[in-house]
Swiss-Prot record:
Subunit and interaction comment: Interacts with creB.
Cited PANTHER family: MAJOR FACILITATOR SUPERFAMILY (MFS) PROFILE DOMAIN-CONTAINING PROTEIN-RELATED, PLASTIDIC GLUCOSE TRANSPORTER 4
Organism in which the protein naturally occurs: Aspergillus fumigatus (strain ATCC MYA-4609 / CBS 101355 / FGSC A1100 / Af293)
Biased composition (Basic and acidic residues): 531-542
Protein name (database record): Probable quinate permease
Modification note: Ubiquitinated. Deubiquitinated by creB, probably to control its activity or amount.
Length: 542
């Protein structure tokens, strides 16, 4: 079987897997490039001697430096927390496209504000810009996964939402290496540390340009009663005429799902809030979505992303450039493994099994690194060169990255984008994204203090959380690969959880065979014409 072989819930025409759907996902994923770059560059920028000298870090106590560094990093997450919620009304009333434009605009303003900071003006502009940039990425982290999942065919939905994760890793790769580059090529100066801040404008500028040409989500258009526009956009994205049986099935499934919503949750702005507080099924899925991000942050990945020099120093690496180089290798490993996850694992292996395997492997690696630090205590016993034990610890650190990246890094984003009804999706994604940024904030705010007080215990702490996540996923999280968005209710109601996917997929295939049989019996062409007669004049020629 080919590495790109797909698992389909029904026969899918080859036209559906076209370049347009990948292009739309790629353009929308410039939001994740912004997030990835911002998450990666800030830690090593704060470690640059030019930055520390300009803002007087050398005159501060170690405790004060840790506090200021934590504040600079964490105010970004605080902004992102609120940005995730601000995106909900924009996405609901004005659509996914305008939500992406809003995210790009706010982020660009924040990035521009940061460029005004210097030693004379102090850190105020940096704090303000980080908060604004956080608002932008919080909004983007809400809107982008929804936009992509609503356009994607079920068989490649994981792969397309995975493009969002790939953008995150590409941005991170640039962010991890840029400070190594400026430290090697530029003398310590204002220019040396301001360049990494200026590069933030590149992904946000590309997003603003590209989003202008994006097609609005057909499912959002259906939910707003703009049926003709919805079918027109869906035909453009699928590259199929509206009377094709695949289109009839998809439009029928969306209509049926919207009708069920009208009679259960409702389609108004406030209806999802009511459901979130009273509907046990919705509350349960919100709990699952938020907890996935709790366990993701419990892996310790963001402690590494934001404070990689501190992390590598705890293992025994010394020297700013050496830490930056090791951080760059960390970024390369994450990016390469993300490609494997995107092309092969997410839609072939699935979400649930990846989470289980990734948590087990990552936990073992973290325990080994923690045990080495406990025994060797490299911080108290520094050496000119790394010992054999230190090299082994670095190996298991990178092996941890190999286990974590194709499992917990992007999979929670994929699952949260697909497991809610259309009218709940914006609010649910806002809650999920906000929970991610809340846990992210706590990790980024207290990591320096944790390493100062707990030392090797930090590694054991994160390993313990990874082990607990295995129990959570096994008993509570169903597999969602290949299941249409409109069938998620049935999936989450199926028991036991570990057999739900096979049960629902078998039922979908049975219903598909019956549907096609009924269509053929009633006259396929006639049925197709009746389904789309009222919009045929507005359809594009594809």
């Amino acid at each position: 079987m080919s590495i790109l072989a797909l698992v389909e819930d029904r026969p899918t025409p080859k036209e559906v897997y076209n370049w347009k759907i990948y292009l739309l996902a790629a353009v929308a994923s410039f939001t994740s490039c912004m997030i990835g770059y911002d998450s990666a560059f800030i830690g090593t920028t704060l470690a640059l001697s030019s930055f520390r000298e300009e803002f007087g870090f050398s005159t501060m106590s170690k405790t004060a430096v840790n506090l200021v560094s934590a504040n600079i990093v964490s105010c970004y997450q605080a902004g992102a927390f609120f940005g995730a919620f601000f995106a909900y009304p924009i996405g609901h009333f004005w659509g996914r496209k305008w939500g992406l434009l809003f995210a790009g605009t706010i982020f660009t303003l924040g990035a521009g504000l940061m460029l005004g900071a210097n030693g004379d003006r102090g850190l105020g502009l940096l704090y303000g810009g980080r908060v604004l940039a956080g608002l932008g990425v919080g909004a983007g982290s809400n809107i982008t996964p929804i936009y992509i999942s609503e356009m994607a065919p079920p068989s490649i939905r994981g792969r397309l939402v995975g493009v969002y994760e790939l953008g995150w890793q590409i941005g991170g790769l640039v962010g991890f290496w840029i400070n190594y580059g400026v430290s090697e090529t530029l003398a310590p100066s204002h220019k040396q540390w301001i360049i990494p801040f200026a590069v933030q404008l590149i992904p946000s500028g590309l997003l603003l340009i590209g989003a202008v040409f994006l097609k609005e989500s057909p499912r959002w258009l259906f939910s707003r009663g703009r049926r003709e526009d919805a079918i027109k956009n869906l035909c453009w994205i699928r590259q199929l005429p509206a009377d094709h049986i695949y289109m009839i099935e998809e439009i029928g499934a969306v209509d049926q799902a919207l009708e069920e919503q009208r009679t259960t949750i409702g389609l108004g702005f406030w209806k999802p809030f009511k459901a979130a507080g009273t509907n046990k099924k919705v509350m349960y899925r919100l709990f699952l979505g938020s907890m996935l991000f709790f366990w993701q942050n419990g892996s310790g990945i963001n402690a590494i992303n934001y404070y990689s020099p501190t992390v590598f120093k705890s293992i025994g690496l010394h020297g700013a450039n050496t830490s930056m180089f090791s951080t760059g290798i960390f970024g390369v490993v994450k990016t390469v493994v993300t490609f494997v996850w995107l092309l092969y694992l997410i839609d072939r292996v699935g979400r649930r099994l990846l989470l289980l395997i990734g948590a087990a492997g990552a936990a073992v690696c973290l325990l080994i690194v923690g045990a080495y630090i406990k025994i060797a205590d490299p911080a108290s016993n520094p050496t000119q060169e790394m010992t054999g034990g230190g090299i082994a610890a670095m190996f298991f650190f990178y092996l941890y990255t190999v286990f974590y990246t194709p499992s917990w890094n992007g999979t929670p984003w994929v699952m949260n984008s697909e497991m809610f009804e259309p009218n709940m999706r914006s609010l649910a994604q806002a809650c999920a994204a906000a929970s991610n940024w809340l846990w992210n904030f706590l990790i980024s705010r207290f990591t320096p203090q944790m390493f100062a007080k707990m030392e090797y215990g930090v590694w054991f702490f994160f390993a313990s959380l990874m082990l607990l996540s295995i129990v959570f996923v096994f008993f509570l999280v169903p597999e969602t690969k290949g299941i249409p968005l409109e069938s998620m209710d049935v999936l989450f109601e199926s028991k036991p959880i570990w057999r739900a996917h096979a049960t629902v997929l078998a039922k979908l295939r049975e219903d598909e065979e019956q549907f096609r049989h009924d269509i053929e019996e009633s006259g396929y062409s006639k049925t197709g014409e009746q389904q789309v007669e009222h919009v045929s004049e507005d359809l594009p020629k594809v």
